[in-house]
Amino acid sequence: MSSARTPLPTLNERDTEQPTLGHLDSKPSSKSNMIRGRNSATSADEQPHIGNYRLLKTIGKGNFAKVKLARHILTGKEVAVKIIDKTQLNSSSLQKLFREVRIMKVLNHPNIVKLFEVIETEKTLYLVMEYASGGEVFDYLVAHGRMKEKEARAKFRQIVSAVQYCHQKFIVHRDLKAENLLLDADMNIKIADFGFSNEFTFGNKLDTFCGSPPYAAPELFQGKKYDGPEVDVWSLGVILYTLVSGSLPFDGQNLKELRERVLRGKYRIPFYMSTDCENLLKKFLILNPSKRGTLEQIMKDRWMNVGHEDDELKPYVEPLPDYKDPRRTELMVSMGYTREEIQDSLVGQRYNEVMATYLLLGYKSSELEGDTITLKPRPSADLTNSSAPSPSHKVQRSVSANPKQRRFSDQAAGPAIPTSNSYSKKTQSNNAENKRPEEDRESGRKASSTAKVPASPLPGLERKKTTPTPSTNSVLSTSTNRSRNSPLLERASLGQASIQNGKDSLTMPGSRASTASASAAVSAARPRQHQKSMSASVHPNKASGLPPTESNCEVPRPSTAPQRVPVASPSAHNISSSGGAPDRTNFPRGVSSRSTFHAGQLRQVRDQQNLPYGVTPASPSGHSQGRRGASGSIFSKFTSKFVRRNLSFRFARRNLNEPESKDRVETLRPHVVGSGGNDKEKEEFREAKPRSLRFTWSMKTTSSMEPNEMMREIRKVLDANSCQSELHEKYMLLCMHGTPGHEDFVQWEMEVCKLPRLSLNGVRFKRISGTSMAFKNIASKIANELKL
């Protein structure tokens, strides 16, 4: 795919020239009147469309963009659609957005989120991408704790393979962190968010300080110029440490403190970390960037290939693209496409509806998905029911073998931007029936520890997933589950020594550690105090803060990382409220310490106030970074140090599970079932059963009670705590507490679910919006008062 392309120009990051549509394609894009997303208000049963995609729900939201889960109408494949409001971005941010799209177009690796289609109008940009249903690695670690080294190795091999592939193409990511590592349905890694990526040339230094501070290389804090790959290598070292230990190697209560620790390069080695893993970390976390290992060298490391002696990790070789797959071509011809436009779109890399359909026809969203393609007919009769008629030149396609029902104008108009068309209720119903239940996909996951990076015969297609790694999502016994799910290791205490377990290792890059070899298979049930820690002194009199910043401040930029539906995610957290004080975690999210930022963004106000970089004055924005509800074991860290806030210098992403007609904050009606629908729908509602899915649960929120009795108890407790709620599904409530616009306002879901393989039901909590402190306070109170 790359052989047909000219090298990507390195964008001058200070250049503010207004970009043009030519950034996205060599041919002019169609204008906004070519695309009409239907308003959901046109019919109670209709869902909005963008081109050939039915928009299902919002799964992420920011200041200037939304991410929606969508289904490709012709193939039935799920995709993530990033909808970006270009009118809200300045010229510099637009340039970075277009650069991100250009870079995504040339990347074709099984562990990198695949771009399928780009739809552009005068005011909006739609990026249709691979949907990673497993969520973020960050959330997985919060829910399940650290990974065993065997599992971490499988994931890390995929990560290194993908990043090394980028470096092969002279592309540096510059924002590698656990939040930008997604998991697909088979628990394989998908690297996302190339918003800060750029092309590099050795000798032509980059000088932009961007990324997440805990993952940032020391030379970035020092304001030094860099080639590119070495900053990714440092970030990979932080990621490896995070996977294996469940905590960050460098942390602090504010940016100044974090900077000092990174520049010292000291980090603790947990007692359970193997010597091989420790030695590998020393190749990543080296203060001198010129002495840092290359990824080609890292691939040959002993730890990387344990259990893979016959399959040593090697640089990924991108296969030649297969643009003449007869099976897909014939299917598309039967839809009404012509062979000429199929070849033109593929060879020209148009990333239009034709190319997207071809890619999706060969794309497997899961190892469990068979080769059978279920195509959805688009009969002409449906046009009579259309509330948003298509342009006159657009003729509906059919799965009939007759290719005459096909428009021809887009061959002359360049890359086609699909129009939005209304479809009959029957067609929508058929599409809904084709959707594979999440629980089926979850329960059918394979368990294997190998992580081979296969050759892909086509960009983004038949991308055989690496053999899935073991999933720890299965419900364990009570004792095992509690200890294994105890989230992340204790943060190194400031100004005081921590209790050690016989041996302490303070590792400095290049120095010899005194850590003895330890088995990677240490029982997760071992007491938490048996952890190595370091005492880090703070020097408040030292120079603080970031390196010299650019003159042009950056505005928030859109992230193209596709988000997943949080409901069925393996990382949807339950509130653990049993027993004494909850455990603490190193992994608060939504705080500035975890925010990706650019050099132009200033933090002097917070530093002058000596506030922790996770605790700042509350933002009045309605787009706060509401995330998944977290288990009680992660709450006291927020209580003691961090408060979630909207400090992301990109989009403050917010996961929502709400109807399309809802936006921001709305008043919820207490206990009202949707009044629309016919008798059949009401009957189906009455007969609905709780979903069976994996989620983090505690003994306090599980019960052998009937689901309906549990719902009555939940409503009773909600009413007693002055919470408003709305019945979204039979066993799911949308809840609200506090005053909209105030810090105490929070929205969350409560759902009664069946625990797989157990004769128990559990209550799943998931935060939608509001600060983690507000959510923790009300959710813990409700969980404690439930009599289940």
Curated annotation (Swiss-Prot):
It is found in: Cell membrane; Cytoplasm; Lateral cell membrane; Cytoplasm, Cytoskeleton. Residues 323-362 form the UBA domain. The keyword Mitochondrion does not apply. Residues 739-788 form the KA1 domain. Residues 1-46, 373-632 are annotated as: Disordered. Its EC number is 2.7.11.1, 2.7.11.26. The modification Phosphothreonine is found at T58, T208, T275, T294, T467, T596. GO terms for molecular function: ATP binding; cadherin binding; lipid binding; magnesium ion binding; protein kinase activator activity; protein serine kinase activity; protein serine/threonine kinase activity; RNA binding. It catalyses: L-seryl-[protein] + ATP = O-phospho-L-seryl-[protein] + ADP + H(+); L-threonyl-[protein] + ATP = O-phospho-L-threonyl-[protein] + ADP + H(+); L-seryl-[tau protein] + ATP = O-phospho-L-seryl-[tau protein] + ADP + H(+); L-threonyl-[tau protein] + ATP = O-phospho-L-threonyl-[tau protein] + ADP + H(+). ATP binds at I59, G60, K61, G62, N63, F64, A65, K66, V67, K82. Inhibited by PAK5; inhibition is independent of the kinase activity of PAK5. Activated by phosphorylation on Thr-208. Inhibited by phosphorylation at Ser-212 and Thr-596. Inhibited by hymenialdisine. Specifically inhibited by the H.pylori CagA peptide FPLKRHDKVDDLSK that mimics host substrates and binds to the kinase substrate-binding site. Belongs to the protein kinase superfamily. CAMK Ser/Thr protein kinase family. SNF1 subfamily. Serine/threonine-protein kinase. Involved in cell polarity and microtubule dynamics regulation. Phosphorylates CRTC2/TORC2, DCX, HDAC7, KIF13B, MAP2, MAP4 and RAB11FIP2. Phosphorylates the microtubule-associated protein MAPT/TAU. Plays a key role in cell polarity by phosphorylating the microtubule-associated proteins MAP2, MAP4 and MAPT/TAU at KXGS motifs, causing detachment from microtubules, and their disassembly. Regulates epithelial cell polarity by phosphorylating RAB11FIP2. Homodimer. Interacts with PAK5; leading to inhibit the protein kinase activity. Interacts with MAPT/TAU. Interacts with MTCL1 isoform 1; the interaction is direct and increases MARK2 microtubule-binding ability. Interacts (when phosphorylated at Thr-596) with YWHAZ. Interacts with YWHAB, YWHAG and YWHAQ. (Microbial infection) In case of infection, interacts with H.pylori CagA, leading to inhibit kinase activity and junctional and polarity defects. This is Serine/threonine-protein kinase MARK2. It comes from Homo sapiens (Human).
